[in-house]
Swiss-Prot record:
Associated pathway: Amino-acid biosynthesis; L-tryptophan biosynthesis; L-tryptophan from chorismate: step 2/5
Matching Gene3D superfamilies: Nucleoside phosphorylase/phosphoribosyltransferase catalytic domain, Transferase, Pyrimidine Nucleoside Phosphorylase, Chain C
Residues the entry annotates as binding Mg(2+) 2: 217-218
Protein name: Anthranilate phosphoribosyltransferase
Family: Belongs to the anthranilate phosphoribosyltransferase family.
Keyword set, alphabetical order: Amino-acid biosynthesis, Aromatic amino acid biosynthesis, Glycosyltransferase, Magnesium, Metal-binding, Transferase, Tryptophan biosynthesis
Amino acid sequence: MSLLAKIVDGKNLSFEEAYELFNELKGSDGVLIGAYLAALQTKGYTGEELAGLARAMRDSAVKLDLGKVADTAGTGGDGSSTINVSTASALILSAFTRVAKHGNVSITSKSGSANVLEALGLNIRVSPERAREMVESTNFTFIFAPAYHPALRPIMPVRKALGIKTVFNVIGPLANPADPAYQVVGVNSPELLEPVAEALEFLGVERALVVHGSGMDEVSPHRETLVLEVGNGVERYTLSPEDFGIEPVKPLPCSSPEESAARIKAVLGGSGRREDRDFILVNASAALYASGVAEDFREGLEMAREALGQGMLEKLEEIACLSKS
């Protein structure tokens, strides 16, 4: 039975079969790629399948050795159209530890991490050598998925043409070629929490949080956030704004990468609206906790708050300049 027939039949793939599937996809034409993506989306995916696809994607990527790094990313596709908070929290996290932010331009939302970082002045297409230099000098680099995953080239236009969420929304945050030790992964559906956590265990992450914040692939600053913490096994719990020491506040919508960048800069500079600031802070707190920098979420939020206005805009300028040199 072919892999496609097995998926259409509703049967799950093993890690090895999922690994093989990625290698088959990268050599296929658009019709077959579309069939695979639609069939997988209809069937749903297991943690083992996600891990096999992500491992194959990492193994096919441009090699990158940055040492022990952290990453913050979401699956996108939640329809919330808020500021790009995972990018903002990654920048704050880099004030404390090394970050290799893996991301792409928008596929299913108005603004991907690459779009926002370009609007913030970064060159998003940096070589492995420049990425290492950036991490060593600033604690931050951006890993632009299309530049580091040449195997995705035949797949990207099919994803765009389909215009629906696919398995690549989910494995994108799992396929960072820098092999991060620490991660926060936001998922757009509660049903993805367990398979993504299982995949992270398969991939050998040291510590990770998989989060879904009341409809968002982020930590919510105004409602409950479901969390699966991966480390020594998997622990499930719920976070509320009170766990961070803040009053609930609803995130505001955002219409473009340029608007997102301007609002992120305002917060990094120590101003900005409370709705943006607290949204960024709770997510930065989660990243600081997942990376082992903060002992708990309240401490993480206070550490992130203290970083705002304390040279963060200058740090952003340094990152942008180094990315272009």
